[in-house]
A protein has these predicted regions:
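Generic short beta-strand
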Residues: 115, 176, 216-218
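Thiol/disulfide oxidoreductase modules built on the thioredoxin-like
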Residues: 190, 197-232
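Conserved Rossmann-like nucleotide-binding pocket used by diverse enzymes
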Residues: 113-116, 142, 170, 195
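Short alpha-helix adjacent to the SAM-binding motif of class I
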Residues: 151, 158, 180-187
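Hydrophobic beta-strand anchors of alpha/beta hydrolase catalytic cores
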Residues: 138-139, 169, 217
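Conserved redox-active cysteine motifs that mediate thiol-disulfide chemistry
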Residues: 135-137, 141-161
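Oxidative protein folding and maturation machinery
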Residues: 1-130, 134-135
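Thiol-based oxidoreductase modules, predominantly thioredoxin-like and allied folds used
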Residues: 165-180, 190-202
Length: 232
């Protein structure tokens, strides 16, 4: 869209060169979020009105995937319970139910999952050991081989420099090779907490946090509850 292209031009691309037009970038992102919210609301209304249509099942599946960590468990259940009994037995409903179950694991308002990861010293440690009680925490999932992930790191460095004392950042890599992960951390100058799930797409990050692609992040409130996901 034109708005997304404007964001790339005004904020994302300049940030790669160390130029952070933060105020302008945030203004565009807020507008992008408003557009997305209106689209999601319209999709939800369509599903309610056409709750006996297979098309609504397809839309519901897309909505669940695109709003993970934005919907609460109650909202997910409300969406799923809104279909007619006849549609509950449709073959496509099985796929939608599986998606809904995955999204419940990372629903907004749910508590974060404490998983065991590896730190830079090679120690197996619980994620909770790196959480900062009483503060907002951000889990940033990435990998050294992921070009979009590497492209996001300048933004993360800037965020750490500006908000590092009050906002706890934890990057969690899904690199399977220890050397690749550590080399990337050093190359990118990532000074905040660094952990790794070397089981990759089959490890606890993929299972407990439903991370099927990177980069992806989840923000937790001071009580360890999920506030939102996919924040950029």
């Amino acid at each position: 869209t034109a708005l997304w292209n404007e964001y790339l031009k005004v904020y994302h691309v300049p940030a790669l060169d160390g130029i952070f037009n933060t105020e302008k970038g945030m203004k565009i992102v807020r507008e992008l979020n408003r557009v997305k919210a209106r689209l999601n609301e319209a999709t939800g209304e369509f599903i309610k009105v056409h709750n006996n249509s297979v098309v609504s099942l397809l839309l519901a599946n897309n909505l669940l995937n695109s709003t993970r960590s934005e919907m609460t468990v109650e909202e997910i259940d409300g969406l799923m319970n809104g279909f007619t009994p006849a549609l509950q037995n449709a073959s496509m409903m099985g796929d939608v139910k599986k998606t809904a179950e995955r999204m419940r694991c990372v629903a907004r308002g749910g508590t974060y999952h404490d998983i065991v990861l590896k730190n830079l010293k090679g120690e197996n440690v619980p994620l909770s050991e790196y959480m900062k009680p009483g503060a907002y925490n951000m889990l940033e999932f990435w990998a050294s081989w992921c070009s979009p992930c590497r492209g996001e790191i300048p933004h993360l460095r800037h965020l750490y420099e500006v908000c590092g004392k009050d906002f706890n950042m934890i990057s969690v890599s899904i690199d399977e090779r220890d050397t690749d992960w550590k080399k990337a951390v050093q190359e990118e100058g990532m000074q905040w907490h660094q952990l790794c799930d070397q089981k990759g797409r089959k490890g606890p990050v993929a299972i407990e946090y439903q991370v099927s692609g990177v980069p992806y992040c989840i923000v937790l409130d001071p009580e360890g509850k999920i506030v939102c996901g996919g924040v950029r």
